[in-house]
Every structure is written in C-alpha cells, then in structure tokens.
A protein has these predicted regions:
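Alpha/beta-hydrolase fold catalytic core
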Residues: 1-43, 66-69, 107, 287-292
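Serine-hydrolase catalytic-loop signature spanning alpha/beta hydrolases and amidase-signature enzymes
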Residues: 49-59, 71
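Conserved hydrolase catalytic core segment
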Residues: 108-148
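Active-site loop/oxyanion-hole signature of alpha/beta-hydrolase fold enzymes
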Residues: 21-24, 29, 34, 58, ...
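Conserved serine/cysteine hydrolase catalytic core
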Residues: 198-257, 266
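Active-site glycine-rich loops that stabilize anionic/oxyanionic intermediates
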Residues: 41, 49-52, 116
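Catalytic histidine-centered segment of alpha/beta-hydrolase-like enzymes
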Residues: 267-283
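Conserved alpha/beta-hydrolase catalytic His-Asp/Glu region
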Residues: 166-220
C-alpha cells in the first residue's frame, strides 16, 4: 500500500493505494491512520455501489473518523480512480477477491460497510476472510434476493447516459430525474467527483464494460451469496431505505428469516442510495452499531 501523505491532522483524509487481484491499483481515502483513538478499534472499510465511487462515502467517512475510527473509503475496480479490469471482470467474486487483498494488506480487524454492489461484495469477502479479519458487517439497501425491477432501473439509468453529457447541468438534470425524492443541489459542481471531462463531454467515472458482462449478473449467484450470509457468525446490520425499489419488505423478511441474528433498521426518508439520501440518520445508526 502506498500513501499520498497530504495533511497530517487525524480528521483529514488522505489518498492511499492498495493492490488488488492481478496487481490492479485500488485507490481510497483514508482517515486516522496511526491515530491513538483508533489503535484498539477495528478499521472501517466503506464499499460503494455500482457506478458510484469512494466520494459517495465522504460525509459518513468523515463522521466515523471524527468519532476516532480508522476509516477507508475504497474505489472498486473499474470505478473512480482505481484501475479498470483488462478482462472486464467485474464479477462479485473478483470484487470480493480485491477486498480480501486489501484486508490482508491492512492486517487488522475490519468492519465492512457495503452499499448495493459493495454490500454483496462484503458478504462474500466476510465469508471468505473469516471473523478474525471481518468483525462486523453493515449491508446498505441490499440483500441477495433484491428486486429485479429496481436493479433494472439502475442499469437503465447507467446505460442511458453512458455516452456522456454536454454539461454538468445536463448531468444534474439526469440525476434529479433519477432521484426525484432528493432535493436538487443549487450547483452541479459536486458532480465533478463522479464525472470526467473528455473531448468536451462529461462522462461517468467508471468503466462502461461494467455493464456489458451479463454472466456477472448477481442474480446468478443468489444461492451462493445467501449461503455465505447464513454462514456468517459476526454481527450484521441491514439498513433499508423505505423508499427503495431495490430491497422490498419481503426481501428484508426473507433475509432476516435466513439470517435471524441480523439486525434491521429502516430509514423513512431514504431510498436505495440511503447514505446520501438521509446521511445524518444513516451515520447515526452506523456509528452506534460500530461502537458496540
């Protein structure tokens, strides 16, 4: 792992790089390395959803760091500043293997917090790594048996805009239409963390090949992911956004029947992008769970 030292205050994030499978570069933001407050507590590793990047965890990461924890928000392969897969392998198994590489490089107990794709990755990574390395798991609006219609809406949004936008304002309009329950920001400047300007157009900062591997559909792996979750002996928290069309109440009930030790919290003002929709409520729940 290499580090761009940046600022030295414990509450400030700095950019770090890990090595994934096949030596892929995985970039993250890190808070509180070597801070005395974090020495006896697990590291928190934040894993974003498909088409997102580490900046979706900016507020939550800062809140956890201000609580004294060692925190890392990681860009998955093919997302953000991490390397793209030369073979376009974005299967949950490949993503999980990358996370396991990061866990071994950290060499200390970790709490995994995963949203959507990151949650499925976390289930498999926690199962493979074992309870000595992964001590707790937080699943953010994802269960192995999620709703196909909600997943299809996400993919449709990503496919529709794969050719980029004329301007940041056009991108902001697309996001606003996709997330009508969110208040539209006054300025689209915040989207620059998720977009890259190339030849006069703004493109999402993820590999388009992420969408073109049908054999990597997590629905083909439902049984494997369910079995992995059922075999976990660590504390698990499932968080659902009440407005979500990806995780249904029936999906929650099914998961809790199969993983009865898991805890469940529903955020009334959030959808599938729960951490961003109601960050204060989300972060409060997560901080309390991690602190136990």
């Amino acid at each position: 792992m290499s580090v761009d030292t940046g600022k030295t205050m414990h509450s400030e994030s700095r950019t770090v790089t890990f090595r994934g499978v096949d030596d892929l570069s995985l970039v993250g933001d890190e808070w509180n390395r070597d801070a005395p407050s974090a020495a006896e507590r697990p590291t928190v590793l934040l894993l974003h959803g498909g088409g997102q990047n580490r900046f979706s965890w900016k507020n939550t990461g800062q809140i956890l760091a201000d609580d004294g924890l060692h925190v890392i928000a990681l860009d998955a392969r093919g997302h953000g500043d991490s390397d793209r897969s030369p073979s376009a392998n974005y299967s949950v198994e490949a993503l999980s293997a990358d996370v396991q590489h990061v866990l071994y490089q950290l060499g200390r107990p970790v709490v995994l917090i995963g949203a959507s794709m990151g949650g499925l990755t976390s289930i498999l990574a926690a199962h493979e790594a074992g309870p000595e390395l992964v001590t707790k798991l937080v699943l953010v609006d994802v269960v192995p048996r999620f709703e196909k219609s909600g997943s299809a809406r996400i993919r449709d949004f990503m496919f529709t805009n794969v050719d980029g936008f004329d301007s940041l304002e056009q991108a902001a309009e697309a996001v606003s239409a996709y997330l009508p329950h969110r208040t539209k920001p006054r300025s689209p400047e915040g989207l620059k963390k998720n977009l890259r300007l190339r030849d006069g157009r703004w493109y999402w900062h993820w590999d388009p090949a992420f969408l073109t591997k049908p054999e990597d559909d997590p629905f083909a792996r439902v049984d494997k992911l369910e079995q992995a979750a059922m075999n976990l002996s660590i504390p698990i928290l499932l968080i659902r956004g009440k407005l979500s069309d990806v995780v249904s109440p029936e999906g929650v009930q099914d998961f809790l029947e199969k993983v009865p030790a898991a805890e469940f919290v529903e955020l009334s003002d959030a959808g599938h992008t729960a951490a961003g929709d109601d960050n204060d409520a989300f972060s409060e729940v997560v901080v309390e769970f991690v602190a136990r």
